[in-house]
């Protein structure tokens, strides 16, 4: 099973991003696959980011942001997952001395995806997802699947 990270979707949403074309191409390459998992937590992050004027020069209005996210929820070939019983482990990790506070969302996302059987994870930040038990974590904008 394969999942993709928030950053790829945000790049695909932003026509001004240098990564836009490559991100769109990667996501479109997954459209007909039956082994894709989309996590609601990831889509929640997408919604927050594409509405944020600190991230996008022209943020999406609420209804357009929801419609953009709904497109990822509506692919009938893809599994949509919401949550998993991972929070005890997330809190254990978060309590570690050198745990960066912003990693808590990544930890929850990674552990949720692993709970649902995801083995391959595409992200532009592979180092942020190392150590969570994925078979492969890679940046599809710089290396092939």
Show which residues each predicted segment covers.
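Active-site neighborhoods of divalent-metal-dependent phosphate/nucleic-acid chemistry enzymes
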Residues: 77-124
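Conserved protein kinase catalytic domain
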Residues: 10, 24-27, 47, 69, ...
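Short, well-structured N-terminal submotif of metal-dependent ribonuclease cores
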Residues: 1-38, 53-64, 127, 131
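Alpha-helix capping/helix-boundary segments
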Residues: 8, 42, 86, 108-109, ...
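Short, hinge-like loop/turn segments at secondary-structure boundaries
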Residues: 53-57, 99, 139-141
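Aromatic- and histidine-enriched alpha-helix N-cap/loop-to-helix transition segments
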Residues: 38-44, 104
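Helix-adjacent hinge/juxtasegments
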Residues: 48-80
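Acidic, PIN/NYN-like endoribonuclease modules and their adjacent C-terminal/linker elements
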Residues: 1, 107-145
């Amino acid at each position: 099973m394969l999942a993709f990270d928030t950053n790829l979707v945000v790049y695909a949403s932003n026509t001004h991003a240098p990564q836009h074309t490559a991100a769109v191409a990667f996501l479109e390459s997954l459209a007909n696959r039956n082994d894709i998992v989309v996590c609601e937590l990831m889509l929640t992050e997408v919604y927050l980011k594409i509405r944020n004027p600190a991230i996008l020069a022209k943020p999406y209005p609420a209804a357009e942001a929801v419609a953009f996210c709904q497109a990822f929820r509506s692919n009938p070939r893809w599994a949509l997952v919401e949550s998993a019983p991972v929070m005890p482990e997330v809190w254990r990790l978060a309590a570690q001395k050198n745990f960066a506070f912003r990693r808590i969302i990544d930890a929850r996302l990674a552990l949720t995806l692993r709970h649902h059987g995801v083995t391959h994870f595409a992200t532009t930040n592979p180092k942020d997802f190392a150590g969570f038990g994925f078979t492969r974590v890679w940046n599809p904008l710089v290396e092939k699947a």
